[in-house]
Amino acid sequence: PVTKPMFWERMVACLLTTQQRSGPNTAVSRFLRTQPLPLGYEACARQDDLGEVVGKVLANFGGLRRTTTIARELSANLTYLENGGWYPVLSHLHEIILHPDPETERRAADFIDEKLKGFGPKQSRNLLQGLGLSRYETPIDSRITKWLNEFGFPVKLTANALGDHNYYAFVSEGFQRLCEACGIMPCVLDAAIFSSFDGDQWTEENAVW
């Protein structure tokens, strides 16, 4: 089962990787490999002013962007979770474990997108992927659209429109249908495309998840 600390740390990772480089040798990856994680759940839950603490921790680490925004988002998300949000969030994730299918994953991703600050269609699926719960609903970004265009997707795709929920759903559905026709799970093809862009830079030592 997904625990609160596990969910929280993956959520922190998702917010940190938004709009900034997160390859194996970046500041984001170095921060997330820090043990224990400076912004772990137990440490954050006992803060009276989480936003201020997060801002200082991220700024002092250095090399990280959007520190003020991330601080505000984490503070808002903790408030939501601690005031009744944990139950529906964890229930959606538990439902995926019980019924692993595209619809269940999509409902969970949409719920996260709706309820948590800093999350859109891509990062909500990033969170599911980080928790090991995403088989069908994968994070789609410019790498995926570039690969699909080169592969011969029937419609010319642009990553700039992926923030629109309907457009994202359209691309995701096409990606899943392609995978079904090829007899491969979407999460596997996603990983293959991802690694083809980063080469062999990721190792067991520098992996974040």
Predicted regions and their residues:
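Short, hydrophobic/amphipathic alpha-helical patches that form generic packing surfaces
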Residues: 9-22, 73-80, 129-130, 188-199
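Alpha-helical ds-nucleic-acid-binding substructure associated with the helix-hairpin-helix region
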Residues: 35-116
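Extended cationic-aromatic binding surfaces that line active-site or macromolecule-binding grooves
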Residues: 2-38, 154, 169
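Structural motif
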Residues: 1-11, 59-70, 180-184
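Charged interaction scaffolds used for protein-protein
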Residues: 86-90, 110-114, 131, 162-176
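Short helix-capping/linker segments at secondary-structure and domain boundaries
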Residues: 18-28, 81-89, 134, 153-154, ...
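A basic, often C-terminal nucleic-acid-binding module that engages the phosphate backbone, implemented
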Residues: 162-209
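Catalytic DNA-binding helix-loop module of base-excision-repair DNA glycosylases/AP lyases
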Residues: 16, 103-156, 193
